[in-house]
């Protein structure tokens, strides 16, 4: 059988006659492919005795190894010829010709706004915390005083993986984890993605929140109000008219929504806030008789739309370069 193997010298001449990498690739398939020359020889080994299989198998493997060496060597030669040819062309290239204009990337408006918010609160002594986007209902709901029967836990509002795991609906899941793992005083913001089953001009299934949390002795609503007023004046770069109106959130008691007066003389809601519910503090093993806390939640897309006069939230995620390149 081995007498039927082509001489490696004969195949080497075939290899040397190839002038392109594609021709060499075709030759490699011819001899080493799944249905190639060597594969057919290997098939014939099955009809031989065990002793002959060992002898002829060794010869075929040596032949295959030598052939691979010749193919790889010639490929290196062809690559060198191709590079040399390219260099010759480049010598005749006119460097004074006007090149194609490169597009200059810009920071996404949501990324820019989150960075701006972080910088503001870092100057006030807050720490930035990030964390799980996939969480359990215990941290996303139960510990935040959102009971099993609460409508926010329904399938139409929340993306569930199974009975216990979900895509977080709020960054508050990291607030409760931080309170469980750290001792007061605590002063953090939690920027990140959150998910809710909603999609229209003012809602997307994924959006961004920045939540703030302060826990210490004698924290009161005045501290919360001052921080929010300072932030809104900073963010909108002017003296904006702000109002706090009573609201309800399961995880805060003395809860409020914060509105600003728009250019159209209408009040627009920009964030929610409140004093942390004593039950939430207890759930995090913090004594509500010794400590108090306040929290606020900023919808990043919402305030970005108000800042830049954008009417449809969906444009942030449509990859429209004409829209995105405005934010430089």
UniProtKB/Swiss-Prot annotation:
Record bears the keyword Cell membrane: no
GO cellular component, one term: cytoplasm
SS bonds (residue pairs): none
Family, per entry: Belongs to the class-II aminoacyl-tRNA synthetase family. Phe-tRNA synthetase alpha subunit type 1 subfamily.
Protein's UniProt name: Phenylalanine--tRNA ligase alpha subunit
Cofactor mode of binding and number, as noted: Binds 2 magnesium ions per tetramer.
Quaternary structure and partners: Tetramer of two alpha and two beta subunits.
EC number: 6.1.1.20
Recorded catalytic activity of this chain's protein: tRNA(Phe) + L-phenylalanine + ATP = L-phenylalanyl-tRNA(Phe) + AMP + diphosphate + H(+)
Organism: Buchnera aphidicola subsp. Baizongia pistaciae (strain Bp)
UniProt enzyme class: ligase
A single GO molecular function term of this UniProt record: phenylalanine-tRNA ligase activity
């Amino acid at each position: 059988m081995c007498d039927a193997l082509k001489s490696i010298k004969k195949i080497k001449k075939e290899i040397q006659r190839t002038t392109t990498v594609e021709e060499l690739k075709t030759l490699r398939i011819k001899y080493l492919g799944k249905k190639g020359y060597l594969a057919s020889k290997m098939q014939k080994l099955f009809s031989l005795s065990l002793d002959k299989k060992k002898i002829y198998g060794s010869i075929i493997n040596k032949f295959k190894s030598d052939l691979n060496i010749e193919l790889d060597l010639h490929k290196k030669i062809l690559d060198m010829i191709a590079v040399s040819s390219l260099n010759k062309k480049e010598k005749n290239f006119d460097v004074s010709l006007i090149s194609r204009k490169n597009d200059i990337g810009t920071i996404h408006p949501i990324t820019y706004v989150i960075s701006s918010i972080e910088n503001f609160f870092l100057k006030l002594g807050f720490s930035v915390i990030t964390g799980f986007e996939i969480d359990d209902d215990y941290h996303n709901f139960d510990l935040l005083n959102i009971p099993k029967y609460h409508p926010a836990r329904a399938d139409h509002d929340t993306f569930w993986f199974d009975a216990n795991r979900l895509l977080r609906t709020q960054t508050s899941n990291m607030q409760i984890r931080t309170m469980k793992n750290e001792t007061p005083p605590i002063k953090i913001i939690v920027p990140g993605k959150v998910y809710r089953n909603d999609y229209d001009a003012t809602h997307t299934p994924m959006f961004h929140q920045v939540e703030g949390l302060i826990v210490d002795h004698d924290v009161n609503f005045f501290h919360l109000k001052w921080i929010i007023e300072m932030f809104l004046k900073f963010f909108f770069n002017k003296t904006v008219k702000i109002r706090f109106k009573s609201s309800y959130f399961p995880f805060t008691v003395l809860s409020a929504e914060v509105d600003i007066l728009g250019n159209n003389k209408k009040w627009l809601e920009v964030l929610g806030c409140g004093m942390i519910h004593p039950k939430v503090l207890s759930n995090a093993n913090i004594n509500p008789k010794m400590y108090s806390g306040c929290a606020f939640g900023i919808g990043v897309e919402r305030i970005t739309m108000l800042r830049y006069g954008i009417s449809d939230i969906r444009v942030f995620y449509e990859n429209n370069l004409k829209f995105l390149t405005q934010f430089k």
